[in-house]
């Protein structure tokens, strides 16, 4: 009895879902317009209903509803056709919440009196929904969103055998997961690209697992369509009045409505004709818009600059006839949310009240059709993504809204034979009032189109240092072709000379800078206006990268001379020896990045004795080896502190000596709380730097170095620990050379290898360098 009640409640629930949809033609079986009912057939003829109630708030789904699971989760017995609640089972079939995808036989129906179950073959969409639901119950993620590869794919891989059995794990199975997320958006999955500013974040629209629907309860598509026709959807879509809609209405009602529209149109035409005969004049004293009069009795042509607004208070009643545009008062379209509104159009049907605007019309009414980006209707089948702020000024707006087309380009709906003659009469009468406006719009677009069709002059950019290295490598790889071409030999020698000058710290000849300097001497205005291009002064960075090849290390690269051991000429030997003469090292500083007060020291270590200190201690004690009363002085501590401006020259010198030329870490002064510098007295022996917030949930360790004479004392271990603690809750990433033994140290902290990058350091090392140029990309997941 209880099972039959439960069965009827499930059927009624499907009936309610079906009645919220609208009828449609040509849909596949199991698909209802407005709400896709995804029914996936499995091998055992069982099906799964992945539809959810669309009436809830799809923006809020943080944690799974455990109480809902306790009430709804049950298993369907194939023999007795009953639903058995999970609480009545003798053993737990699945350790995952919301998982009842089993071919189940209850203990009453089985021959041995034991419950029998067998895993059904799951589809990828079911697996993804189960994974995301269980992740939400764990409370992980960010605002209910989960990362596609790091969270969802990792969960599926962890439970692969339990969910997918012996299904073969292909090399691109994670791409299948990404495809399921994209295809199921926005019906089942919602992207977090808007909230976090980066792709790869997803969550369930309704945080409930997919429900299993056995074959006995499956409703036919025809039944769903019949029930859906009796109740329209309650999600209205605002459309523009005047657009024709498909509707199955009584022919008598259609004829009456057509007659009423025709009378309204005739009334509007009479009013316009009367206004043309009694055309007023334009008050020039209060209007700032230039007006050009063509002839008496004709509407003045209002000439507008882009972004200018007409002042309607300065226009007479004769000038208040609206342009050919939809009525400002929209009408509600109660069509199905899954059906795009019909884009066929009819002439503007205006009444006398519509001729006098109550408020200022939209600015888009006074621009050409090519400049208008939206038609006022958002396709409900798409998920609206607002364009980035920077794209507004740089180019056309890109979104899901469709471009407005001219009246002559809009596809007309097929009309009946009775409507055609009347329709042609209306069109012919409205054509006279629209022809002049369309002609002026075409004339205005012609010079703009001619201007746009002109080929743009090429804009040349200087070759970067890395591109010069690649070009020189290519020339050296084909000596035969270079020997036969004088131009190639000349280019090769020029590149070699430029490289030699960089190694020796000599200035390079730059024609653009010479011409720019000459123009600045003649007149500063010419230099500022020349081409609208701001040239970089000598010494600025020339390491350009595309978005695909962007590297965080590029921000520290400069065009300084690359000779090994080269140092700033302003750096004194005393500063390089003892760091600085700054006596105010014991004062706190304020971080410009987080506005936190940073103490003078992170840690003062009196216990660690690196090999360098042990050697110094032995040298001092050797002098007093014959003095039994000699007591050694206490050693100075190792001071861990935040980076300061006086540290930068020495750190840059060490980076250029032990890493590669052209490194300048001055940018790290903008976020000193994500740095650590180790001092012995005033000598810098180690340092580490991290770039915070390279992504929404990720930080990047850019440089970590300990002087070779101070290693194997735990200094690097504490620096890594400190940098990790500064970004609690965020992933920490880094690149490490493939031949660097420090990889073992990173693995102790939980860093995992994600990628092996070939020739990662080839961009930075000199050509003659023998260092390993490949790198591992490591990530510490939090």
Curated annotation (Swiss-Prot):
The modification N6-acetyllysine is found at residues 231, 292. Residues 13-33, 251-282, 315-346, 400-460 are annotated as: Disordered. GO terms for biological process: negative regulation of transcription by RNA polymerase II; regulation of cell cycle; regulation of cell division; regulation of DNA-templated transcription; regulation of embryonic development; regulation of transcription by RNA polymerase II. Expressed in skeletal muscle, heart, lung, placenta, brain, liver, pancreas and kidney. High expression in skeletal muscle and heart. Lower expression in lung. Transmembrane segments: none annotated. GO terms for molecular function: histone acetyltransferase activity; LIM domain binding. Residues 638-782 form the N-acetyltransferase domain. Residues 256-276, 405-426, 446-459 have a biased composition (Basic and acidic residues). Pfam families: Acetyltransf_1. Keywords: Acetylation, Cytoplasm, Nucleus, Phosphoprotein. Its main location: nucleus. SUPFAM superfamilies: Acyl-CoA N-acyltransferases (Nat). One of its GO terms (cellular component) is cytoplasm. The modification Phosphoserine is found at residues 4, 285, 416. Interacts with the LIM 1 domain of CSRP2. Component of the ADA2A-containing complex (ATAC), composed of CSRP2BP, KAT2A, TADA2L, TADA3L, ZZ3, MBIP, WDR5, YEATS2, CCDC101 and DR1. In the complex, it probably interacts directly with KAT2A, MBIP and WDR5. Component of the ATAC complex, a complex with histone acetyltransferase activity on histones H3 and H4. May function as a scaffold for the ATAC complex to promote ATAC complex stability. Has also weak histone acetyltransferase activity toward histone H4. Required for the normal progression through G1 and G2/M phases of the cell cycle. This is Cysteine-rich protein 2-binding protein.
């Amino acid at each position: 009895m209880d099972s039959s009640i439960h069965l009827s409640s499930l059927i009624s629930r499907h009936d309610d879902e079906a009645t919220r949809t609208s009828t449609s033609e040509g849909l596949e079986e199991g698909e209802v317009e407005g709400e896709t009912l995804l029914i996936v057939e499995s091998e055992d003829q069982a099906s799964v209903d992945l539809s959810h109630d669309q009436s809830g708030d799809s923006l809020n789904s943080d944690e799974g509803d455990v109480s809902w699971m306790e009430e709804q989760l049950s298993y369907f017995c194939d023999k007795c056709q009953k639903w058995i609640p999970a609480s009545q089972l003798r053993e737990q079939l699945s350790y995952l919440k919301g998982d009842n995808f089993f071919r189940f036989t209850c203990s009453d129906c089985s021959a041995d009196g034991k419950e029998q179950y067998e895993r059904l073959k799951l589809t990828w969409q079911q697996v993804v929904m189960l994974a995301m639901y269980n992740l939400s119950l764990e409370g992980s993620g960010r605002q209910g969103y989960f990362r596609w590869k790091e969270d969802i794919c990792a969960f599926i891989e962890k439970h692969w055998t339990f969910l997918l059995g012996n299904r073969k794990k292909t090399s691109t199975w994670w791409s299948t997961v990404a495809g399921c997320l994209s295809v199921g958006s926005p019906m089942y999955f919602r992207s977090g690209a808007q909230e976090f500013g980066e792709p790869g974040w997803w969550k369930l629209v309704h945080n409930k697992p997919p429900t299993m629907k056995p074959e006995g309860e499956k409703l036919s598509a025809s039944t769903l369509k019949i029930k859906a026709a009796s109740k329209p959807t309650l999600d209205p879509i605002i459309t523009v009045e005047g657009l024709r809609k498909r509707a199955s209405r009584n022919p008598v009602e259609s004829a009456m409505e057509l007659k009423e529209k025709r009378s309204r149109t005739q009334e509007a035409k009479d009013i316009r004709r009367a206004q043309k005969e009694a055309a007023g004049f334009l008050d020039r004293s209060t209007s700032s818009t230039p007006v050009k009069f063509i002839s008496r009795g004709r509407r003045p042509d209002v000439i507008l600059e882009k972004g200018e607004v007409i002042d309607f208070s300065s226009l007479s009643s004769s000038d208040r006839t609206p342009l050919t545009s939809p009525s400002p008062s929209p009408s509600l379209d109660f069509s199905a949310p899954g059906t795009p509104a019909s884009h066929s159009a009819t002439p503007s049907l205006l009444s006398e009240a519509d001729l006098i605007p109550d408020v200022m019309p939209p600015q888009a009414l006074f621009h050409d059709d090519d400049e208008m980006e939206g038609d006022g209707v958002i396709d409900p089948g798409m998920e609206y993504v607002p364009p980035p702020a920077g794209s507004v000024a740089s180019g056309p707006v890109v979104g899901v809204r469709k471009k407005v087309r001219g009246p002559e380009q809009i596809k007309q709906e097929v009309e009946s034979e009775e409507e055609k003659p009347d329709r042609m009469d209306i069109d012919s009468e409205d054509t006279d009032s629209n022809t002049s406006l369309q002609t002026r719009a075409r004339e205005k677009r012609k010079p703009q189109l001619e201007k746009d069709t002109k080929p743009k002059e090429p804009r040349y950019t200087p070759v970067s240092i890395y591109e010069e290295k690649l070009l020189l490598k290519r020339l050296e790889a084909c000596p035969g072709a270079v020997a036969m071409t004088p131009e190639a030999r000349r280019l090769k020698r020029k590149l070699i000379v430029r490289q030699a000058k960089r190694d020796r710290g000599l200035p390079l000849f730059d024609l653009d800078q010479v011409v720019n300097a000459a123009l600045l001497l003649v007149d500063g205005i010419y230099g500022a206006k020349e081409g609208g291009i701001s040239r970089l002064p000598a010494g600025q960075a020339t390491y350009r990268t595309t978005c695909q090849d962007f590297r965080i290390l590029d921000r520290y690269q400069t065009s300084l001379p690359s000779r090994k051991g080269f140092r700033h000429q302003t750096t004194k030997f005393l500063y390089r020896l003892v760091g600085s003469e700054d006596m105010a090292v014991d004062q706190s500083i304020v971080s410009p990045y987080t506005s936190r007060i940073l103490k003078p020291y992170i840690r003062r270590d009196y216990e660690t004795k690196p090999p360098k200190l042990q050697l110094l201690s032995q040298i001092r004690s050797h002098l007093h080896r014959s003095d039994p009363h000699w007591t050694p002085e206490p050693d100075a501590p190792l001071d861990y502190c935040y980076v300061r401006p006086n540290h930068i020259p020495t750190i840059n010198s060490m980076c250029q000596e032990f890493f590669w030329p052209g490194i300048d870490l001055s940018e790290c002064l903008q976020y000193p709380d994500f740095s650590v510098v180790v001092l012995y007295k005033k000598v810098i022996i180690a340092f580490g730097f991290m770039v915070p917030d390279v992504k929404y949930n990720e930080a990047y360790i850019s440089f970590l170095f300990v002087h070779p004479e101070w290693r194997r004392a735990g200094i690097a271990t504490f620096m890594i620990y400190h940098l990790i603690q500064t970004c609690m809750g965020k992933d920490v990433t880094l690149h490490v050379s493939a031949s660097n033994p420090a990889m073992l140290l990173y693995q102790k902290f939980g860093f995992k290898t994600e990628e092996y990058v070939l020739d990662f350091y080839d961009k930075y090392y000199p050509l003659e360098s023998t260092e390993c140029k490949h790198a591992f990309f490591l990530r510490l997941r939090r």
